[in-house]
């Protein structure tokens, strides 16, 4: 009120003709109204009541309370599914209880006689309902060398059996297990490898290669090749499109391994014939048939078939190459060394009484890491490759059946393919160089220690040896300079002689 009175007085003094300016900011307005002390703290009479109400409002407006309210009151579309799920759980528990009552061992058979009968029936089924594996014993009266085997002749409607009753399926399984495929991949590849077309490919390819290397017979080889082509096309068409690339990247290599394993298993006495050259020729032939390209040289190095020299494809041990007398002598020596021992000597020096590890076992225990030659690498060249060409086996099949459109096929584009022209010559590997450097370093250290000990005892003698060594180096350097000078003088005189030779050649 006092503020209003003062304002009225000021306005009356100023006169009617002069107006006061309005406030330009909130501060001026508050000061003009005499409210510059606002806002003041507001005190409610019932503070506890207000705080309780505020807390309740916060709780009611929280996410949990809103979600709970909606869950309890809003009707849901998937409520029928929840009811169905709860009923299924209930019924599954009832079914489990019911089955546990049915298959109780005591209610099914008695403890003694019925159980023994069941065991006998199980053994009988295992014995007669499992597919038999033909184990080749040493007492079999079949020939174990190439000389005692012959091709019985091509039959159009029947595959020629492999020698010594070998089973193609077991050979394929042996090769697949050696690759250590993943379990899921192994099951997929197994169905394709053991298909009828793949089995026929192994039979006919083995006999074709047998005739080609040891019993040349053009007529039978041609008949076998015709069926090989048909079997390969059948196998190619049976593989799903999504698996074709992956399968036919490994199939030629696996087929070559299977043929090699068949030769090794069928003719153990002729294993010396199946050397690295034999593997190289066999693999090149199979790869060229399937894809038209040769594999990398030495592709067979990754084959895990070294154990074929000691074990069969079924895992049974082969007879050792030693004679009976040698084996008896070795066994007697081993028994005598193992029986005659002194426990006190063994405890004092246990290393002297440990059995030595054979070279073969030590070689297998260590992982062989490849070391490259320290010389230059392989030489490469560029060859033309038909990018749209067919596999030779498939192309032969198309020509053999004279399918329409083969001769009218458009010309395919060719690309340049990098190929190894020549492998590097055998030379010391980097591992050999490192070993030799370590040996030389050890020798240098030994010589240095000897020289150091000699210098402390006989310094004058060491000084004389050092002077002799320097004199030897100077003389060798002088001889080398003289040789270089003589070579340079002879090279400077050589152009004239070559010119004369060229002139005589032109006159002639």
UniProtKB/Swiss-Prot annotation:
Q: Which InterPro entries match?
A: FAM227
Q: Name residues in a coiled coil.
A: none
Q: Where is this region: Disordered?
A: 1-22, 485-508
Biased-composition ranges, Low complexity, are 486-497
**Source species, domain of life:** Eukaryota
Q: Which family does it belong to?
A: Belongs to the FAM227 family.
- Name by which UniProt lists this protein: Protein FAM227B
Question: Per the UniProt entry, what species is this protein from, by scientific name?
Answer: Homo sapiens (Human)
Q: What is the lineage of its organism?
A: Eukaryota, Metazoa, Chordata, Craniata, Vertebrata
- Which gene codes for it? FAM227B
